[in-house]
């Protein structure tokens, strides 16, 4: 590799589609990923060749949104189990190059807890990824989902909160006027950020981190705007009339953020200033974002070799035990 004299490069938010999951996608969810259809289903030679060409040693794979979050409590667990078994087979075909985050059918929290245990202890998954609202309705801070966080803490694995499209009422009021002309406005252009930033703030306010003090959460896209807004959020939540919460302390102690789909020098520098370089991990968001610009950006970004190494592989090696 050319980056940092051949040091390891691990990209941890890299997506694929399993047709046994995507066949359940409906409506707006069914339109996600259409422009990269061939690449997102390629989990073999083409993907590895692209990694080789761009200097990426390892991808941590996760199913693309909305994954299993839209599935019901009855059918969802079997779909998630089959998807994780399939992902295990994908990773075993290239065990030095591919790892995985488990899919969980959160509509059935007990089954999700059991599947997280199985996926980590039997299949070697590095944690789990949860995509947006369960059933299009429920944020992940709802207490029925807390057993998932309890088990993640016990297993010492992170939960990656990935965006999903917002609640339909939010779409109707805030977004629908422009999503026909600009479908990206619904997802990565704003809707995704709105949804996941809200979910993350709610998680802090819920008290889940007091209950599970070693719980670890990952956010993509340089923290979904929250590092930029952290000072103001912390101020607002501690003004007279609020119960008060140590938002900044909780966020910087429990959350990790990745560079997925966000290769901006100023944004990265702000995140380092707010969170410290030890909580930032490299990711690309392949294939929604091409592989090529990510490593090239890291070669030129104004960081010393030690900090680049932390972002590119050391932080992921520590957090995901790679």
Task: Name every feature range the model reports, one short phrase each.
Residues 1-12, 16-58, 85-93, 114-118, ...:
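Mid-to-C-terminal alpha-helical segments outside catalytic/metal-binding sites
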């Amino acid at each position: 590799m050319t980056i940092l004299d051949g040091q390891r490069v691990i990209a941890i938010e890299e997506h694929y589609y399993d047709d046994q999951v995507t066949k359940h996608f409906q409506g707006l969810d069914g339109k996600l990923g259409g422009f990269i259809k061939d690449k997102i289903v390629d989990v073999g030679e083409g993907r590895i060749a692209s990694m080789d060409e761009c200097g990426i040693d390892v991808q941590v794979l996760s199913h693309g949104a909305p994954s299993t979050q839209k599935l019901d409590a009855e059918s969802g667990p079997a779909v998630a189990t089959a998807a994780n078994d399939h992902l295990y087979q994908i990773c075993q075909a290239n065990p030095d190059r591919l790892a995985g985050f488990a899919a969980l059918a959160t509509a059935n929290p007990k089954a999700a807890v059991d599947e997280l245990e199985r996926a980590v202890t039997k299949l070697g998954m590095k944690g789990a990824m949860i995509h947006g609202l369960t059933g299009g309705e429920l944020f992940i801070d709802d207490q029925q989902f807390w057993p998932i966080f309890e088990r993640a803490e016990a297993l010492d694995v992170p939960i990656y909160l990935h965006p999903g499209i917002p609640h339909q009422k939010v779409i109707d009021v805030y977004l629908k006027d422009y999503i026909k002309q600009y479908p990206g406005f619904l997802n990565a252009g704003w809707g995704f950020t709105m949804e996941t930033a809200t979910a993350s703030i709610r998680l802090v306010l819920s008290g889940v981190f007091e209950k599970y003090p070693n719980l670890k959460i990952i956010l993509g896209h340089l923290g979904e705007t929250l590092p930029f807004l952290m000072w103001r959020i912390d101020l607002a939540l501690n003004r007279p009339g609020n119960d008060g919460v140590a938002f900044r302390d909780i966020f910087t102690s429990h959350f990790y953020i990745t560079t997925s789909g966000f290769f901006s020098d100023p944004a990265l520098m702000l995140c380092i200033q707010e969170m410290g370089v030890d909580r930032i991990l490299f990711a690309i968001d392949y294939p929604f974002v091409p592989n090529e610009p990510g490593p090239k950006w890291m070669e030129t970004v104004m960081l010393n070799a030690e900090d680049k190494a932390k972002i590119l592989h050391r932080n992921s090696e520590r957090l995901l035990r790679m």
